[in-house]
């Protein structure tokens, strides 16, 4: 049984409230869970201490027993100092696309041609 530490949505329409729960990965998002581990209220201010509440002791216990947190929960755990979130590394994303590289090469070529023409005119 693969266990996930994830968010289960509660609250009413347009007023979300989430429970941080331990659940089987195959169970529905708001369905059966094994243990309630905390809560997240995105409607509160970001600096409010009640915005994210976690039971760090139980979360550590379940992480040691193989439970996998979802990305959003891992962000909360990283902020609380319970778990370490590795920085994502995508070096390809930093490179411009093919057409942008072509445009940059054309622009550089035009600048070089203009500089050469200016040098010829100065002589």
From Swiss-Prot:
The record's comment on protein family reads:
Belongs to the bacterial ribosomal protein bS16 family.
Q: What is this protein called?
A: Small ribosomal subunit protein bS16
Q: Where is this region: Disordered?
A: 87-123
The GO terms describing molecular function are: structural constituent of ribosome
* NCBIfam families assigned: S16
Protein species of origin? Rhizobium etli (strain CIAT 652)
Q: Which PANTHER family match?
A: 30S RIBOSOMAL PROTEIN S16, SMALL RIBOSOMAL SUBUNIT PROTEIN BS16M
InterPro entries under this entry? Ribosomal_bS16 (IPR000307), Ribosomal_bS16_dom_sf (IPR023803)
Say which domain of life the source belongs to: Bacteria
Query: Could you read off the lineage of the organism from its UniProt record?
Result: Bacteria, Pseudomonadati, Pseudomonadota, Alphaproteobacteria, Hyphomicrobiales
> Basic and acidic residues bias: where?
99-110
Q: Name one GO biological process term.
A: translation
Residue ranges with Low complexity bias: 111-123
Q: What keywords are assigned to this protein?
A: Ribonucleoprotein, Ribosomal protein
* Pfam families named in the record: Ribosomal_S16
Q: Which GO terms describe its cellular component?
A: cytoplasm; small ribosomal subunit
